[in-house]
Amino acid sequence: MRVMGVDPGLTRCGLSMVEGGHGRTVTALDVDVVRTPADMDLAHRLMLVADAAEYWMDTHRPGAVAIERVFAQHNVRTAMGTAQAGGVIALAAARRDIPVVFHTPSEVKAAVTGNGNADKAQVTAMVTRILGLQTAPKPADAADALALAICHCWRAPLLARMAAAEAKAAEAKRRYTERLAEQRKAVRG
């Protein structure tokens, strides 16, 4: 499974591409950080982020895009910019029929380090180790994008099994409800 990991941001947006193999084998294919000037207007900054993400999607052809879910930050303006960057990337993926999955920072940290409260240094160290890199990816946005892609490679099979189980349970409930309705009808009839 080829996964594009995205650590969204306006000033720095981490992009990564990994290939998931058998078991927990993951290989890094590419990683970069898109930078936009803080003094540029918002629409053009978003366009630069979207253009880079679209180029990556068209070049690498991922099977899924994993984006960090933004749910709270101390600075509302930063949170808005981060969410907007993630949104334009999700839109670019949707236009290409590429599934988009959002993972929380704690899910990513737990998947990569085993600790949902790990710090950036721990995440970077584990990403370096998991991917067998000679040097740690820098800046942190690059490491975070790789961590997101790794997280999705490892969580995707579990998420698929859970979705299948939920669908099976919904179908069983539907059949049960139909049988119950038929029995009630027979008793009344």
Swiss-Prot record:
Keywords: Cytoplasm, DNA damage, DNA recombination, DNA repair, DNA-binding, Endonuclease, Hydrolase, Magnesium, Metal-binding, Nuclease. Its main location: cytoplasm. The keyword Acetylation does not apply. Its EC number is 3.1.21.10. Mg(2+) 2 binds at E68. One of its GO terms (cellular component) is cytoplasm. PROSITE patterns: RUVC. It is found in: Cytoplasm. Its cofactor is Mg(2+). Binds 2 Mg(2+) ion per subunit. Disulfide bonds: none annotated. GO terms for molecular function: crossover junction DNA endonuclease activity; DNA binding; magnesium ion binding. GO terms for biological process: DNA recombination; DNA repair. The active site is at D7, E68, D141. The keyword Acetylation does not apply. Belongs to the RuvC family. Homodimer which binds Holliday junction (HJ) DNA. The HJ becomes 2-fold symmetrical on binding to RuvC with unstacked arms; it has a different conformation from HJ DNA in complex with RuvA. In the full resolvosome a probable DNA-RuvA(4)-RuvB(12)-RuvC(2) complex forms which resolves the HJ. This is Crossover junction endodeoxyribonuclease RuvC. It comes from Nocardia farcinica (strain IFM 10152).
